[in-house]
Amino acid sequence: MGKHRGKKYLEVAKLVEIGKLYDIREALELVQKTKTAKFTETVEVALRLGVDPRHADQQIRGTVVLPHGTGKTVKILAITSGENIEKALAAGADYAGAEEYINQIQQGWLDFDLVIATPDMMPKIGRLGKILGTKGLMPNPKSGTVTPDIAAAVSEFKKGKLAFRVDKLGSIHAPIGKVDFDLDKIEENFKAFMDQIIRLKPASSKGQYLRTVAVSLTMGPGVKMDPAIVGKIVG
């Protein structure tokens, strides 16, 4: 069954030429023109990569510091103990502690966007695997969310550090700013993100690595970029 689209969506969708692959600047400029929502929409990137996540060496995940942040306020839970609790809170964590939060999560509490933990807490957090894992919230050293320097990690993520991972279909979705950002800032964020994606290309990845690259607003139509152009300009 087709998804019902509102009148405003259908109007802005006409701005996007079907089948066309846009260059970076052109696509981002067009995306800003597709705003229809009353709230400040997020500019999102959707990638389809030439990887097979069933192979461990092709499970792409990592972090990138977007030069201008995502524009989103990230609610952070720091799972740690002792003096690190105060350090995490001072760095901007919304919640910090250990057993009390682990117990709350087991009871269904999920009022946070990101979990950062010190390594000593991981055996305890292990029992939250089914809850956090399915939502992509499980702390992991590769995504910079398991670290002894929890204060620095909290500070970086609050400033705009972005964690990403490929899903089982070989896709990655990530926010790169808000629609009301200056176009140059969105472009710089996009390039920083793509630079990291390209650097993480597995040696075992066969054929075309960047299969599709598209950008859109939260409620808007997708605008496809030319993967060949993205691959040349960035990296």
UniProtKB/Swiss-Prot annotation:
Keywords: Repressor, Ribonucleoprotein, Ribosomal protein, RNA-binding, rRNA-binding, Translation regulation, tRNA-binding
One GO cellular component, as annotated: large ribosomal subunit
InterPro entries (alphabetical): Ribosom_uL1_bac-type (IPR005878), Ribosomal_uL1 (IPR002143), Ribosomal_uL1-like (IPR023674), Ribosomal_uL1/biogenesis (IPR028364), Ribosomal_uL1_3-a/b-sand (IPR016095), Ribosomal_uL1_CS (IPR023673)
Biological processes per GO annotation: regulation of translation; translation
GO molecular function terms noted in the UniProt entry: rRNA binding; structural constituent of ribosome; tRNA binding
Record's function text: Binds directly to 23S rRNA. The L1 stalk is quite mobile in the ribosome, and is involved in E site tRNA release. Protein L1 is also a translational repressor protein, it controls the translation of the L11 operon by binding to its mRNA.
HAMAP family named in the record: Ribosomal_uL1_B
Quaternary context: Part of the 50S ribosomal subunit.
Protein family: Belongs to the universal ribosomal protein uL1 family.
Classification via PANTHER family: 54S RIBOSOMAL PROTEIN L1, MITOCHONDRIAL (PTHR36427), LARGE RIBOSOMAL SUBUNIT PROTEIN UL1M (PTHR36427:SF3)
Name of this chain's protein: Large ribosomal subunit protein uL1
Native organism: Fusobacterium nucleatum subsp. nucleatum (strain ATCC 25586 / DSM 15643 / BCRC 10681 / CIP 101130 / JCM 8532 / KCTC 2640 / LMG 13131 / VPI 4355)
